[in-house]
């Protein structure tokens, strides 16, 4: 599953009407930011918390930032 994560995709709410706070990796700032997820579909740049977002995107794509969790 984690091999298919694309950290370069923009956040995608999806067609459902939920309001779930999730995290996505923002490539330009190399940080994880929150967005409102509808609850279904969307894309793989979608994480339940900042820890997993940084784990799968910042370290994998850019190496450890050296500043701790952002």
From Swiss-Prot:
Main location: secreted
Keywords: Disulfide bond, Protease inhibitor, Secreted, Serine protease inhibitor
Example of a GO cellular component annotation carried by this entry: host cell membrane
GO MF entries: potassium channel regulator activity; serine-type endopeptidase inhibitor activity; toxin activity
Gene3D superfamilies associated with the record: Pancreatic trypsin inhibitor Kunitz domain (4.10.410.10)
SUPFAM superfamilies on file: BPTI-like
Family as reported in the entry's similarity comment: Belongs to the venom Kunitz-type family. Scorpion delta-Ktx subfamily. Delta-Ktx 1 sub-subfamily.
Feature type site, description Reactive bond for trypsin: 17-18
Lineage start: Eukaryota, Metazoa, Ecdysozoa, Arthropoda, Chelicerata
GO process annotations (BP): envenomation resulting in negative regulation of voltage-gated potassium channel activity in another organism
All copies of domain BPTI/Kunitz inhibitor, residue ranges: 7-57
Subcellular location as annotated: Secreted
Expression across tissues: Expressed by the venom gland.
Protein name (record): Kunitz-type serine protease inhibitor BmKTT-3
Disulfide bonds: 7-57, 16-40, 32-53
InterPro entries: Kunitz_BPTI, Kunitz_BPTI_sf, Prtase_inh_Kunz-CS, TFPI/VKTCI-like
One Pfam family per UniProt: Kunitz_BPTI
Domain of life per record: Eukaryota
UniProt function note: Serine protease inhibitor that inhibits 85% of the activity of trypsin at a molar ratio of 4:1 (Ki=760 nM).
Miscellaneous comment: Negative results: has no effect on chymotrypsin and elastase. Shows weak inhibitory activity on mKv1.3/KCNA3 potassium channel.
């Amino acid at each position: 599953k984690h091999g298919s994560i694309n950290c370069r995709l923009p956040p995608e709410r999806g067609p459902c009407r939920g309001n779930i706070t999730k995290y996505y990796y923002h490539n330009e700032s190399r940080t994880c930011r929150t967005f409102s997820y509808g609850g279904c579909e969307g894309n793989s740049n979608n994480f339940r918390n900042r820890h997993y977002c940084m784990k799968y995107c910042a370290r994998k794509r850019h190496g450890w930032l050296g500043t701790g969790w952002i």
